[in-house]
């Protein structure tokens, strides 16, 4: 599904430059659930931004579904992202002046979808994420966990082939975090490819593969045993 070849990213710092990604070579297969881990400043979020087409200042090759994304214009990359990628941010990124229903509908409003069909899709998402009662509220009226559920609903409503999540449970208490990770597992079992950035070993245990970054370099790539049950209490409390 995805292949990165010698992808690098740097920022100018005075007369020199600071590298945040160094010679990244990575393949991601359809249906994988990948966790990206590493210390602060390792390049985790930078990698996610490249995968999401939010950053186009990198060097190297990015193949997405056999398309050479690195050879496309910015407008064409944005179109590729709209059709294929959903993004969940740690800070939610909901629009304050839109209701829950309107926030979830936003990705659909960019597509040529009849209004009646959009309304049905939004209603299904509200029901799926158990936030029907919150549909007319604004983000400021929601708890952190509720806002994150809205963010996830918005990210997946157009059935993206790829779901990217940057510390999606970082500000949540354990029960909310567990609920969101169970939703991720369900989405993955239904065929969605997921790449999450996290510091949490508990969250990492939900994935099928863990990638380690350090100082911009990919230093580890290991498969995770697929759990038949939810992570143990011992793992949750680590």
For each of these PLM feature ranges, what is it?
Residues 2-210:
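ABC family nucleotide-binding domain
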Residues 11-12, 222-224:
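Short regulatory "switch" loops immediately downstream of catalytic or recognition motifs
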Residues 31, 104, 220, 229-232:
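Intrinsic disorder/low-complexity signal
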Residues 210-223:
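H-loop (His-switch) and adjacent beta-strand-loop-beta switch element
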Residues 225-238:
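ABC ATPase nucleotide-binding domains
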């Amino acid at each position: 599904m995805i292949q990165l070849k010698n992808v690098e990213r740097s920022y100018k710092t005075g007369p020199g430059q600071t590298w945040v990604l160094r010679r990244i070579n990575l393949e991601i297969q359809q249906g994988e659930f990948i966790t990206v881990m590493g210390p602060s400043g390792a390049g985790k979020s930078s990698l996610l931004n490249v995968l999401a087409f939010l950053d186009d200042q990198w060097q190297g090759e990015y193949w997405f579904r056999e398309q050479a994304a690195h050879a496309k214009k910015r407008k064409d990359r944005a179109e590729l992202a709209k059709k294929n990628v959903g993004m969940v941010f740690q800070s939610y990124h909901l629009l304050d002046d839109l209701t829950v229903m309107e926030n979830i509908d936003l990705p659909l409003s960019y597509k040529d979808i009849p209004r009646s069909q959009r309304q049905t899709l939004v209603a299904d998402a509200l029901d799926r994420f158990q936030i029907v009662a919150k549909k007319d509220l604004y983000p400021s009226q929601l708890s952190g966990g509720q806002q994150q559920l809205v963010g996830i609903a918005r990210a997946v409503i157009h059935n993206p082939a790829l779901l990217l999540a940057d510390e999606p449970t970082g500000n949540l208490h354990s029960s909310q975090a567990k609920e969101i990770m169970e939703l991720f597992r369900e989405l993955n079992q239904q065929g969605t490819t997921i790449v999450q950035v996290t510091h949490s070993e508990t969250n990492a245990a939900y994935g099928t593969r863990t990638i380690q970054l350090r100082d911009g370099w990919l230093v580890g790539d290991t498969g995770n045993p697929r759990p038949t049950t939810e992570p143990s209490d011992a793992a949750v409390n680590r």
